[in-house]
UniProtKB/Swiss-Prot annotation:
Region (G4): 136-139
Name assigned to this protein: Elongation factor Tu
Protein family according to the UniProt entry: Belongs to the TRAFAC class translation factor GTPase superfamily. Classic translation factor GTPase family. EF-Tu/EF-1A subfamily.
A molecular function GO annotation: translation elongation factor activity
Organism: Francisella tularensis subsp. tularensis (strain SCHU S4 / Schu 4)
Gene name as annotated: tuf
Length: 394
């Protein structure tokens, strides 16, 4: 008898607030929790509770993030808000808080500012699928034309980074007035959440994606063959499935002849399971840690890609000195380190600890990768940076 499946009545969607400092991200977060709690049940969270974000560690990097939850009529939202700009950069690059969509907060009184642009760019680089816009502090702008101008600027900025500016929902409101209970502005929060329900797609569940298992270990079991072990990253695998071994060496095909978990035999394994998979016709030496087992054709090995990278500061245990072009650290993908060479963008001579930078990386061996894959940069086993694959080149 299978375990009872955990039933969620509403789909679960992860979102976050992004935008320039002091444009009202945290106030909006507080306003949404208050209005949704009144309409749909749940807990209202005050500005101060959200603002004093606890420290978390993601891949050895310290990030301050606040997590709140609320219900819309159709969905359950988990929402992240960060106090400082650096926290956003780290959060998005490490994927510590996965975002199915983002709420871009822009003050109508100030219009788009440098971090507005940077957060849109980061969203593009790390693969945030959709953005909805909340023009905040509209109560401070009397001029209708000025509001339209700011809206136009934001839409153009979205277009620049390949988000559909014209189709993006833009809600005009005031988070503070909504918290104070001003009905007209409370209505704008309801409108915003409705726009999120309609415009941000519900994420595909991990079990519905193509199967992939990063290989951690390989054993040979006499009389039975070769077993690879690891945790299934996504998808489902059944006995009899054809799979490929991808990365480091030329791709090989094989068939799954057994799946076991805690020494019990199963018919199938799914995302999140730690399993041993028996593969037909492969010797122990044909497979190694760092490769992946996957659905045939679903993922290809690559060596050259563009990445968005955050370099740890000295305080975070990173490098004490900058690095220059020709830097050759190890790149840790899933279960293994691969050496690679770094090319910096034109006009960038060096990268300081604490910076974030776009770079092109060429690995000495191919690794199974998709855009959006996260990695760590290491020197002799010590993490000195975190990155995400933004664009595959070859």
């Amino acid at each position: 008898m299978a375990k009872e499946k955990f039933e969620r009545s509403k789909p679960h969607v992860n979102v976050g607030t992004i935008g320039h400092v002091d444009h009202g991200k945290t106030t909006l977060t507080a306003a949404i929790t208050k209005v949704m709690a009144e309409k749909n049940g749940g807990m209202a969270r005050k500005f101060d509770e959200i603002d004093s974000a606890p420290e978390e560690k993601a891949r050895g990097i310290t990030i301050n993030t606040s997590h709140v939850e609320y219900e819309s009529p159709n969905r359950h939202y988990a929402h992240v808000d960060c106090p400082g700009h650096a926290d956003y950069v780290k959060n998005m690059i490490t994927g510590a808080a996965q975002m199915d969509g983002a709420i871009l907060v822009c003050s109508a009184a100030d219009g788009p500012m440098p971090q507005t642009r940077e957060h849109i760019l980061l969203s593009r680089q790390v693969g945030v699928p959709k953005i909805v816009v909340f023009l905040n502090k509209c109560d401070m702008v009397d001029d209708e034309e000025l509001l339209e101008l700011v809206e136009m600027e934001v839409r153009e900025l979205l277009d620049q980074y390949e988000f559909p500016g014209d189709d993006t929902p833009v809600i005009m409101g005031s988070a503070l007035r909504a918290i104070e209970g001003d009905e007209a502005y409370v209505e704008k929060i309801v409108e915003l959440v409705q726009a999120m329900d309609d415009y941000i797609p519900a994420p595909e569940r991990d079990t519905e994606k193509p199967f992939i298992l990063p290989i951690e270990d390989v054993f040979s079991i006499s009389g039975r063959g070769t077993v690879v072990t690891g945790r299934i990253e996504r998808g489902v695998v059944n006995i009899g499935d054809e799979v490929e071994v991808v990365g480091i060496r030329p791709t090989q095909k094989t068939t799954v002849t057994g799946v076991e978990m805690f020494r019990k035999l199963l018919d199938r394994g799914e995302a999140g399971d730690n399993v041993g998979i028996l593969v037909r016709g492969l010797k122990r030496d044909d497979v190694e840690r760092g490769q992946v087992l996957c659905k045939p054709g679903s993922i290809k090995p690559h060596t050259k890609f563009e990445a968005e990278v955050y370099v740890l500061s000295k305080e975070e245990g990173g490098r004490h000195t900058p690095f220059f072009k020709g830097y050759r650290p190890q790149f840790y993908f899933r279960t293994t380190d691969i050496t690679g060479a770094v090319e910096l963008p034109e006009g960038v001579e060096m990268v300081m600890p604490g910076d974030n930078v776009k770079m092109t990386i060429t690995l000495i061996n191919p690794i199974a990768m998709d855009e959006g894959l996260r990695f760590a940069i290491r020197e002799g086993g010590r993490t000195v940076g975190a990155g995400v694959v933004a664009k595959i080149i070859e």
